[in-house]
Amino acid sequence: MKSIRILFTLTMSVLLGLTSCEETTEAGEFDNWKERNTLYINSIAAEARANTYGDWKIFLAEGLDTAKVWGNENYVYCHVVKSGNGTEHPLFTDSVVINYNGRLMPSKTYPDGYKFDSSYKGELNPSFNVPVTLLLNETVKGFYTAVQHMVDGDVWKVYIPSLLGYGEGGTTGVPGYSTLIFDINLVSFHRPKK
């Protein structure tokens, strides 16, 4: 009887030990990042193309031939949050006065997307935030493509495929193949003096 009790105790100990050693594999934040970003930008492109409420604008990346057929990764998708009252658009060589917030696509840890850059804290409030001045030609292609279509006072949520952002190499705080999401408020712009 004593040997049965010892055998039972040993068996249970081994089973409990094996159960506690069972591997649990949880998906990492950036696992399959390239594929997930491709699916994400394709879903944004489909929503923008459907344009159910007329509040989307789609722009082919600056410098690409409009006569050719391009994939989703060659366009910038802009959701118009608020239309401004300006009448002119900034040029590539202009400096822009803007409020902006840059994020990655939503993920498990960051449901609103990981914020990698911002000119303000908290929520966008054009009457409260202090805008920054940027040279438009020193931003990524997707950013300057979108901003060149904005007018003073516009507030847009801009979705930039990785090809028009930081590409496969990424940059500090932004892994390669990342879709970029910018909340942009164009306050004004200035032309260089000739």
What kind of region is each of these model predictions?
Residues 16-20:
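C-terminal motif of bacterial Sec signal peptides marking the signal peptidase cleavage site
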